[in-house]
Amino acid sequence: ENQVGLHYQIHRGIGVHHRAAMDRNESLQVAITVGGSPAMSLAAVMPLPEGLTELTFAGALSGRRVRMIRGSHAPVYADADFAIVGRVDPTATMPEGPFGDHLGYYSLQRPFPFMKVEHVWHRKDAIWPFTVVGRPPQEDTTFGQLIPELTDPIIPTVIPGVKAVH
């Protein structure tokens, strides 16, 4: 009860923070937010280099700092339509999957961490955005096409010597 399974890449983003909390044998405070500005949605799906946060990228895209709400919980994105806040135990897992992917294959069921939900907030008239995922072309294909348009111009400045990525 009051749990949310978390399925993420253990070597990136939240996985790095979770590993650090595990090494300290501490629970990890997490805020899952849904909705808000298009810049935040785009930042969430971008393959950003380590060290460049989604918040920084979204702020750069929108031309202003991302507003956050701070309290006794993890910081929460102020413009989100929904926020689910809780803690991830350093060692507890639950089965997640199988999941279908956009090529028509399924991943295996595996143990993943889960969050014990402490708070759920939502805006009045909130909207839960989603995309239809499946064999291309689907809605998620648009994100895949947009990413190179945004990243191709900056590749040479981020990776010296590389002129293009195909």
Where would I find each of the regions flagged by the language model?
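Charged, compositionally biased interaction regions
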Residues: 36-166
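Internal alpha/beta scaffold segment
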Residues: 2-45
